Amino acid sequence: MNGEPHLMSVMVPCLMKTVSGGQVRSIALGHPLLDDYLEFVAARARPNTLIAVAYDLKVFFTVIVKQPADITTADVLTFIKAQRAPRRGAGVLRLEDGEAGLSARTIKRRLASVSGLFGYLIARADAGVNANPVPRGLATRGRRGRAGVRGAPLIRAPRTLPRVLEPAEADAFVAALRTQRDRAMVAAMLLGGLRRCEVLGLRLPDLRPGERRVFVADGKGGRQRIVPISARFFSAVAAYYDSERPRTSSTETVFVVLKGPRRGQPLSAAGLDEIIEGARKRAGLTHLTCHQLRHTCFTRLREAGMALEAIQAQAGHASIESTRVYLHLANDWLAGEYLRAAEAIDAQSVRS
């Protein structure tokens, strides 16, 4: 392989990470070209994106043990087949997409990571890579036997609607929360639509109780926004600061650990997930995530008549296409719109 390291000896189970101040600053797989690409990604993407790309590449080159310049489209198709292989015993299918093995969304993400690597190597022009082995789709034939420019997607990811909480479920869940801190965090998601990472990233200067708004300094994709939020959130935060938050905590982060050796330190994502899971069980709910609280917030806002563009701004969506899902989730709003339109049509028919 012209002196290049053999990938089998490089793709070790653990990624090599450099952590500074709790954030991943760099990550490596031990192969020069792959590590150069990861440095390129690190300069342009967020730490979680970097980790995901590195893991996807690790998986790909563990399955396809070749140098990047030797990878072909046939290898990519072999990788897809391997990812579709059952992981939990023969004949086990995923309910959400009717396929065995990993979900279509996971495989599509991994293919995107691999495609990004080869796009980078092509641009470098010194890696011996002249074409991207990840095809955009499978060629199909047009009508009348002509070769069509259309392509069938390599992976079909089902478009599924996220589940939202019914009002009674939301009430039971909130009642099962044990501290003012927990009530404030849930209110941020359920009433303001904040993401989990945005809740955990809130600092005291970000809170604007007089305006009933919070400043999201580090949203998805690094985007900032100001989010209006219910007075119930600020009431819970005030009660949390008055009676629960350790006075000795020196961090500006709003939500901190209340007990144990990490008392006063910023609450972690795992810690918040544990809080949500405990309240879910006490409320007798079968399934609940932080993102489900966010979906519930925007669905209820849409049902209450909030414009789709306003929900997009509240959610921090880069594209309104991401927001359109709440048109389908807001069943009461959709039914009302249909009935109004149907009544107008019926009235026109009667007049004619």
Model-based region annotation:
Residues 2-21, 341-352:
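C-terminal secondary-structure termini that scaffold catalytic or DNA-interacting sites
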Residues 34-48, 55-151:
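N-terminal core-binding DNA-recognition domain of tyrosine recombinases/integrases
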Residues 93-99, 147-180:
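Long, amphipathic, Lys/Arg-enriched alpha-helical "connector/arm" segment
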Residues 163, 167-196, 221-223, 248:
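Basic, Lys/Arg- and aromatic-enriched nucleic-acid-binding interface segment
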Residues 197, 201-235, 242:
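Conserved tyrosine-mediated DNA breakage-rejoining catalytic core shared by Y-recombinases
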Residues 218, 315, 320-340:
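Catalytic-site neighborhood detector that most strongly recognizes the C-terminal catalytic loop/helix
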Residues 227, 273-313:
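Short, basic (Lys/Arg/His-rich) helix/loop patches that form interaction surfaces
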Residues 231-285:
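Active-site/catalytic core of tyrosine-dependent DNA strand-transfer enzymes
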